[in-house]
């Protein structure tokens, strides 16, 4: 396994390009949207999992300082990998369940959605109640401004303590070149004065070099729910409820589909209502109340909110809206363009792909 990791790290650009190219080709597999063909979806899932694992290896590649990527040893960082693998497998589960069990496939889809919801809720808790990015597939490593300031103060106080504790007046900053050079000279003098130590000289030199090269890693403390509510009050509660609604919305949607059927307006309307309510709560947590109590979103979190609004377009692809409105518009556009060379052919293929994707819950679930 280590040899394979080394190969992926050395050829990361080639691996990423190949994964994107192969995943794109899977949409052109014959019988891609046939209810009885599990093979094409299995190939798609295998390539998806292969690409996901490779991306995970690349993201956790050792840095020049010897650290392992941004992931470190945080156990919560295994959750994004699990979510990505589940999303790669869910279409195979749907197709296989439909082939072998017919309408009972919804029981298996509910199971996969429940697993994703549980993992995402665990990730939401373990991340200190931060917004999930890309449904939890991208770690939210943006620090809260208050936490960053306190950690910077702790880091500065720790760096100011030299080998003689508070008596050390050589406040060298190890983050810049001059500070590293002065720290190295200080470390060299310290080594010369402690030659009688039981620790071998070569070991001491390595330890001092690591201390100079590597800035101190201050572990970020995860915020608890009680701390979120104490700090942000009602806004913190609105944010948490809004995020939980976003996480559980796909499970709620598929539960109502099993009860009322995919052609009923009830699941469609309830899903849209949950999305609207969740987004409204998140928006109110940002603007409502005192400024000190408002929830401030980072740049990636603002992008995530925009992404969530964009995927509302999937409601146009979900039944019964698709059958009653969207399909008619697609067929009308296809008829108007079918006589134009090349454009008519491309339009036909696009409509075919959209209608095929619409037939699979997992392609339009937005989960």
UniProtKB/Swiss-Prot annotation:
Membrane-spanning parts: 237-257, 264-284
GO cellular component: endoplasmic reticulum membrane; peroxisomal membrane; peroxisome
Phenotype of null mutants: Not viable shrunken seeds. Starch accumulation in mature embryos, cotyledon and hypocotyl cells. Developmental delay during early embryo morphogenesis.
Extent of Polar residues compositional bias: 147-159
Keyword Transmembrane helix: yes
Post-translational modification: The detection of an additional immunorelated polypeptide of 52 kDa suggests a post-translational modification of PEX16.
GO biological process: fatty acid biosynthetic process; peroxisome organization
Tissue: Expressed in roots, siliques, seeds, cotyledons, leaves and flowers. Low expression in leaves and roots.
Membrane topology (UniProt): Multi-pass membrane protein
InterPro entries the UniProt entry points to: Pex16
Region span, Disordered: 135-173
Compartments in which it is found: Peroxisome membrane; Endoplasmic reticulum membrane
One Pfam family hit: Pex16
Key words, A-Z: Endoplasmic reticulum, Membrane, Peroxisome, Peroxisome biogenesis, Transmembrane, Transmembrane helix
Subunit-level organization: Interacts with APEM9 (via both N- and C-terminus).
Note: Travels from the cytosol to peroxisomes via the reticular and perinuclear endoplasmic reticulum (ER) and an ER-peroxisome intermediate compartment (ERPIC).
Function: Involved in the formation of peroxisomes, lipid bodies and protein bodies.
Similarity field: Belongs to the peroxin-16 family.
PANTHER family per the UniProt record, alphabetical: PEROXISOMAL MEMBRANE PROTEIN PEX16
Domain remark text: The internal domain (235-279) containing two internal membrane helices and the intervening residues that include the basic cluster VRS is sufficient for targeting recombinant proteins to endoplasmic reticulum and then to peroxisomes.
Protein name (Swiss-Prot/TrEMBL): Peroxisome biogenesis protein 16
């Amino acid at each position: 396994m280590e040899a394979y990791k080394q190969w992926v790290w050395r050829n990361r650009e080639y691996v990423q390009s190949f994964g994107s190219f192969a995943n794109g080709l899977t949409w052109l597999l014959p019988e891609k949207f046939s209810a009885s063909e599990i093979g094409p979806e299995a190939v798609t899932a295998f390539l998806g999992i292969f690409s996901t694992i490779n991306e995970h290896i690349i993201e956790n590649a050792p840095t020049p300082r010897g650290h392992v990527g941004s992931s470190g040893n945080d156990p919560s960082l295994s959750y994004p990998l699990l979510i990505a693998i589940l999303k790669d497998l869910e279409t195979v589960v749907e197709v296989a369940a439909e082939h072998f069990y017919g309408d009972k496939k919804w029981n298996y889809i509910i199971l996969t959605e429940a697993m994703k919801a549980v993992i995402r809720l665990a990730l939401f808790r373990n991340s200190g109640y931060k917004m999930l990015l890309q449904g939890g597939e991208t770690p939210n490593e943006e620090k809260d401004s208050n936490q960053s300031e306190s950690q910077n103060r702790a880091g500065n106080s720790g760096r100011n303590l030299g080998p003689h504790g508070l008596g050390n007046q050589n406040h060298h900053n190890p983050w810049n070149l001059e500070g590293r050079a002065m720290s190295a000279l200080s470390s060299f003098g310290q080594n010369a004065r402690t030659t009688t130590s039981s620790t071998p000289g070569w070991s001491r030199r390595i330890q001092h070099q690591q201390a100079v090269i590597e800035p101190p890693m201050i572990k970020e403390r995860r915020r608890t729910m009680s701390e979120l509510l104490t700090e942000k009050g009602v806004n913190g509660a609105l944010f948490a409820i809004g995020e939980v609604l976003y996480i559980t919305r796909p499970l709620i949607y598929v539960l109502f589909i099993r009860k009322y059927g995919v052609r009923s307006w009830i699941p469609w309307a309830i899903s849209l209502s949950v999305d609207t309510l969740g987004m409204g709560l998140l928006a109110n947590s940002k603007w409502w109340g005192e400024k000190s109590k408002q929830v401030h979103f980072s740049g990636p979190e603002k992008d995530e909110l925009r992404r969530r609004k964009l995927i509302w377009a999937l409601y146009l692809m979900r039944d019964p809206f698709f059958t009653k409105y969207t399909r008619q518009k697609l067929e009308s556009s296809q008829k108007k363009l079918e006589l134009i060379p090349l454009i008519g052919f491309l339009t036909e293929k696009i409509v075919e792909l959209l209608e095929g994707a619409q037939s699979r819950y997992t392609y339009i679930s937005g989960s």
